[in-house]
Amino acid sequence: MTFQKAIVTEAPHRARLVSDRLIPKLRDDYILVRTVSVALNPTDWKHILRLSPPGCLVGCDYAGIVEEVGRSVKKPFKKGDRVCGFAHGGNAVFSDDGTFAEVITVKGDIQAWIPENLSFQEAATLGVGIKTVGQGLYQSLKLSWPTTPIEHAVPILIYGGSTATGTLAIQLAKLSGYRVITTCSPHHFELMKSLGADLVFDYHEITSADHIRRCTQNKLKLVFDTISIDVSARFCDRAMSTEGGEYSALLDVSIARTNISSRWTLAYTVLGEGFTSEQIVFQPYPTTMSSGRNFGM
C-alpha cells in the first residue's frame, strides 16, 4: 500500500494537504502520471466551497510524466512521455479524479504530449483552457479549424478577452481566419492586440456594445462569452446583429431574443463520463469526447 501527498476536500467546505492519500488505481482508459506542475482554476475553489463532498481529490490542470498506460488507451503514450491536460478535480462520482497530488490518473485519450518548446510550468496552464475553447468555438459555434481558415473574415465577439480562456480563444479564432473583437479593461488593450484582436473595447463603457454593432455593420452573429453572467449576456445581446446569431457561454446563462441561439458548454463533458454538479446529473456525452480528442496540441 503506497501513500502520497495530496490536497483533498473535507467538511466544512474546505481542503487540506494530507500525506496518507493512496496512489489511485489505474482504470483501463486512463494513464498514470507523476505530476511536475499544476495550475489553478476558479473551478477548483468552487468545488471546494460547494460542489464536492469530503474526500475528493482537488485540481484540474497539470503537467507531468507518464508512469503507466491503461490497456484501452488509443493514443500511443508510453512511460516517460511528457504530457499535460486536465482531470475532473473534485468529482463526486470518482473521488480520485484530481490533479493536486504526486501521482494521478487522467483520461488517456484527452491528454496531450508537451511540445519540446514548452516547460512543464507552461504546459500545466493549457488543459482546461484548451478544452473549453475547443468546445466553445469549434463544437458549439462551429468555427472553421485553424488548419482550414475561412477566406473572408467573419466577425466574432470574444467577451472577456483578458481572461485565461479569452486569451486562448482570441489566438485560435484569429488562426481560423475570423475578425476578432474583444472586451477588457483599457490596461489590457495592447495585450489583446498582440494576441490578434482586431478591435478591443472597454466593457465598462455603456456605449461599447452599441459601438461594436456599428463597427460590424450589424453583422455580428457569433459570440463566445468567457464571463457568462447576466451582465455579460446583456452586453452581448446589444452588440449582436438585429438579425440574430449564435451565443455560446461557459455557464448557464442565455439571451432571451428569439432569433439568437443560446447554449453553454462544460469542459468536463469531453471526458465522456457521467457526473453530478449542484444536484444536476450530467449524462455521458460520447460524441463530445470524440470531438474533445481534437482539442489539443
Curated annotation (Swiss-Prot):
Pfam families: ADH_N (PF08240), ADH_zinc_N (PF00107). The keyword Oxidoreductase applies. CDD domains: enoyl_reductase_like. One of its GO terms (molecular function) is oxidoreductase activity, acting on NAD(P)H. InterPro entries: ADH-like_C (IPR013149), ADH-like_N (IPR013154), GroES-like_sf (IPR011032), NAD(P)-bd_dom_sf (IPR036291), PKS_ER (IPR020843), Trans-enoyl_RdTase-like (IPR047122). Its EC number is 1.-.-.-. SUPFAM superfamilies: GroES-like, NAD(P)-binding Rossmann-fold domains. Belongs to the zinc-containing alcohol dehydrogenase family. Monomer. The genes involved in HC-toxin biosynthesis, called collectively TOX2, are organized into a diffuse cluster that spans >500 kb. All of the known genes are duplicated or triplicated within this region, with some variation in copy number and chromosomal location among different race 1 strains. Trans-enoyl reductase; part of the diffuse TOX2 gene cluster that mediates the biosynthesis of the HC-toxin, cyclic tetrapeptide of structure cyclo(D-Pro-L-Ala-D-Ala-L-Aeo), where Aeo stands for 2-amino-9,10-epoxi-8-oxodecanoic acid. HC-toxin is a determinant of specificity and virulence in the interaction between the producing fungus and its host, maize. TOXD does not seem to play a role in HC-toxin biosynthesis. This is Trans-enoyl reductase TOXD. It comes from Cochliobolus carbonum (Maize leaf spot fungus).
